[in-house]
Amino acid sequence: MVSEFPGPGSRVPWRPRDEALRVNVGGVRRLLSARALARFPGTRLGRLQAAASEEQARRLCDDYDAAAHEFYFDRHPGFFLGLLHFYRTGHLHVLDELCVFAFGQEADYWGLGENALATCCRARYLERRVARPRAWDEDSDAPSSVDPCPDEISDVQRELARYGAARCGRLRRRLWLTMENPGYSLPSKLFSCVSIGVVLASIAAMCIHSLPEYQAREAAAAVAAVAAGRSAEEVRDDPVLRRLEYFCIAWFSFEVSSRLLLAPSTRNFFCHPLNLIDIVSVLPFYLTLLAGAALGDQRGASGEELGDLGKVVQVFRLMRIFRVLKLARHSTGLRSLGATLKHSYREVGILLLYLAVGVSVFSGVAYTAEEENEGFHTIPACWWWGTVSMTTVGYGDVVPETVGGKLAASGCILGGILVVALPITIIFNKFSHFYRRQKALEAAVRSSGQREFEDLLSSVDGVSDVSLETSRDTSQEGRSTDLETQAPREPAKSHSY
């Protein structure tokens, strides 16, 4: 805190104490009265007005023009206009043109505390300041923007910059973009169509395999046949489906190995959910081969051990259903759904909690009213009825017969409608946000041509340094420009407050 009055024995003050203060904030010039500033001596301008020397005053501003007696501040001019209103009324209002964090930084710089905020703006400011900074407010029903997140684009550019020092980096980068971005080029679109076709063919083959006329023998029977030394032809699958399965596995293995070899970062490759889905889609096939080899080596094993290995083989085959998740790489909706579930764990938890409470309450009521009827003999048995009723599925396998049971069922159904509808609305809004955001990002990539996109990626190494130097030069030259061209010397053009 700078002393408000000069010390004893000092010479003539460097400026009259009651002289108006001439300030220039980001090109906005104002003349402030000493009496208005004296009302708030703890603020930066109040301390500047009471400065005992020019040296103390220079510590409080960015620059000082001794000839014009003008103090320069390289700060936001819009906030300065709100600051003038504060010196007139004693209340500070939040500006919509500034985010809450930038507003807080400006307020701290000028020496204003939270008590200076007007009552109409204080609650909104504190609520937004406590919230964690996110790309968008997760607690808000209306997303603020659907523009692509700059952080996501920066992460992609940072990863692609690794190709600059790699061997055959330009070729690897082009192949990587072809495999990862369906809208990057015509070959990438063809590759995406082939990949989708292989995934659909694999799923269709798995479904056809379950039909009786195409279904292979049960795994346990096949193991027993091999153990008995009978022909292996008796236990093989349909040859057409088997060849189709081999082709799909070969394609999936090619995709995984190619992405692994072309990936800019191996560590980030194994952390990406879509890459893990690709690995899981081919892993059951190779595990089945290992299990088959183990079965071949255990011809003398007991029937129980062979039956257990046969069940393991069945589990591995069942894991092929995860191949349908590979479509998420080529579907904007599936990727948006995954992002929605990732950012909606609170709402999903609340939904499950509401359902659990409702099922427990209404199951107890139904057990009391329908204890003698079949299906309601225990409270855990009533949980199935409560879950089906609250989710409004209504299989009808268990039906209450008494008046009390029917009333409980009515309350359970109505409560389920309300309980499920509330969190679902929030989840749907988030899905809409992520979907529009993903579509906007894809549109931004498609709008730029392939050559422009390549030039952008090839220059990503020098973008940061050039931007940094440019911003420094601009910040250093901007203030002199304001002082020389935008700051007239005539006091008559300054506004007095």
From Swiss-Prot:
The chain crosses the membrane at residues 187-208, 240-262, 274-291, 310-330, 346-367, 407-435. GO terms for molecular function: potassium channel regulator activity; voltage-gated potassium channel activity. It is found in: Cell membrane. Residues 380-391, 392-399 dip into the membrane without crossing it. Residues 1-186, 263-273, 331-345, 436-497 are cytoplasmic. A motif (Selectivity filter) lies at residues 392-397. It is a multi-pass membrane protein. Keywords: Cell membrane, Ion channel, Ion transport, Membrane, Potassium, Potassium channel, Potassium transport, Transmembrane, Transmembrane helix, Transport, Voltage-gated channel. Signal peptide: none annotated. Detected in brain, but not in the other tissues tested. The highest levels of expression are in olfactory bulb, cerebral cortex, hippocampus, habenula, basolateral amygdaloid nuclei and cerebellum. Residues 464-497 are annotated as: Disordered. InterPro entries: BTB/POZ_dom, Ion_trans_dom, K_chnl_volt-dep_Kv, K_chnl_volt-dep_Kv5/Kv9, SKP1/BTB/POZ_sf, T1-type_BTB, VG_K_chnl, Volt_channel_dom_sf. Residues 209-239, 292-309, 368-379, 400-406 are extracellular. GO terms for biological process: potassium ion transport; protein homooligomerization; regulation of potassium ion transmembrane transport. Residues 470-482 have a biased composition (Basic and acidic residues). Pfam families: BTB_2, Ion_trans. SMART domains: BTB. GO terms for cellular component: nucleoplasm; perinuclear region of cytoplasm; plasma membrane; voltage-gated potassium channel complex. The transmembrane segment S4 functions as a voltage-sensor and is characterized by a series of positively charged amino acids at every third position. Channel opening and closing is effected by a conformation change that affects the position and orientation of the voltage-sensor paddle formed by S3 and S4 within the membrane. A transmembrane electric field that is positive inside would push the positively charged S4 segment outwards, thereby opening the pore, while a field that is negative inside would pull the S4 segment inwards and close the pore. Belongs to the potassium channel family. S (TC 1.A.1.2) subfamily. Kv9.1/KCNS1 sub-subfamily. Heterotetramer with KCNB1 and KCNB2. Does not form homomultimers. Potassium channel regulatory subunit that modulate the delayed rectifier voltage-gated potassium channel activity of KCNB1 and KCNB2 by altering their kinetics, expression levels, and shifting the half-inactivation potential to more polarized values. While it does not form functional channels on its own, it can form functional heterotetrameric channels with KCNB1 and KCNB2. Each regulatory subunit has unique regulatory properties that can lead to extensive inhibition, significant changes in kinetics, and/or substantial shifts in the voltage dependencies of the inactivation process. This is Delayed-rectifier potassium channel regulatory subunit KCNS1. The lineage of its organism: Eukaryota, Metazoa, Chordata, Craniata, Vertebrata. The gene is Kcns1.
